[in-house]
C-alpha cells in the first residue's frame, strides 16, 4: 500500500501542540525568574502554571489499547503501558533506505526510558489516543527527522513483547535522500548503515532487541 504523505498534522493537533509548547516556554521563564520577593499572587500563578504543565504532559501520553486484530478497545497512560502490565498498544516503525540500499538508523538518546543509547529503527513512536496509524506515522517522522513528504510502503503488522511492554507494531519503509533534522534531546545521531554492517553487529548489544528481531524478519522475507 503506497500513499504519498504530503498532508499536515490535523489543525486541532497542530493547535494543541503549539499551545502546549508556548505554555511550557512561559512556565520555564517564570520559574527561572521566580524569587523569594515575588508577591504571593505571582507565586500562586506560577504554581498553577506548573500544575498545567504536568497536566499537559499527562494528556500528551495517553495511548489507545487494542486487541490482537488492531481494534481499539480502551486507553491507558504511557506509564501503565510500560510497567510490565503488557497492555497491548499500537506503535509505528518506518525504515528509511537510500539509493545504495543502506538503512538509516537513529541512536536513541541517553534520556530515553527504554533502551537508551542503542541504535534503533529510522523512525519509531507511539500512536496517540484518537489518532490514526498513518497520522502517527507522519507526525513521528516530522518530529523525529523533520521529513514532511515521503511515500511509505506498508510491510507488515505484528505483536512484539518485551519484559515491560507489549506492542502492536505497524511497519513501513520508504526511500529518502534529503536532509534530516532531529531533536538532540531525543536522538543522539543518525547514520546510514549497510545491510552487511548491521548483520555483523547483531547480538552485540548495539541495537535494540525490537530492531534486531524486526530486521532479521524483513531481511529473511526480502522486504528491505
Model-derived regions, located:
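Nudix hydrolase/Nudix homology domain
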Residues: 56-58, 129, 156, 163-224
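Acidic, metal-coordinating catalytic segment for phosphate/diphosphate chemistry
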Residues: 60-93
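Acidic pyrophosphate-coordinating catalytic loop
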Residues: 82-87, 114, 157-169
Amino acid at each position: 500500500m503506497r500513499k504519498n504523505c504530503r498532508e499536515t498534522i490535523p489543525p486541532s493537533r497542530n493547535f494543541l501542540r503549539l499551545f502546549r509548547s508556548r505554555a511550557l516556554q512561559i512556565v520555564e521563564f517564570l520559574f527561572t525568574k521566580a524569587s523569594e520577593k515575588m508577591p504571593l499572587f505571582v507565586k500562586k500563578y506560577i504554581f498553577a502554571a506548573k500544575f498545567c504543565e504536568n497536566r499537559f504532559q499527562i494528556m500528551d501520553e495517553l495511548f489507545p489499547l487494542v486487541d490482537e486484530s488492531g481494534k481499539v478497545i480502551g486507553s491507558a497512560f504511557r506509564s501503565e503501558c510500560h510497567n510490565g502490565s503488557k497492555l497491548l498498544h499500537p506503535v509505528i516503525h518506518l525504515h528509511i533506505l537510500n539509493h545504495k540500499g543502506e538503512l538509516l538508523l537513529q541512536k536513541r538518546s541517553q534520556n530515553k526510558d527504554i533502551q537508551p543509547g542503542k541504535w534503533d529503527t529510522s523512525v519509531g513512536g507511539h500512536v496517540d489516543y484518537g489518532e490514526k496509524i498513518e497520522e502517527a506515522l507522519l507526525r513521528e517522522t516530522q518530529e523525529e527527522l523533520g521529513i514532511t513528504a515521503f511515500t511509505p510502503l506498508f510491510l507488515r503488522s505484528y505483536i512484539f513483547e518485551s519484559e515491560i511492554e507489549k506492542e502492536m507494531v505497524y511497519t513501513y519503509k520508504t526511500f529518502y535522500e534529503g536532509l534530516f533534522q532531529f531533536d538532540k534531546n531525543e536522538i543522539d545521531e543518525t547514520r546510514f548503515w549497510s545491510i552487511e554492517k548491521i548483520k555483523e553487529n547483531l547480538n552485540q548489544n548495539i541495537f535494540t532487541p525490537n530492531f534486531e528481531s524486526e530486521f532479521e524478519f524483513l531481511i529473511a522475507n526480502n522486504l528491505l
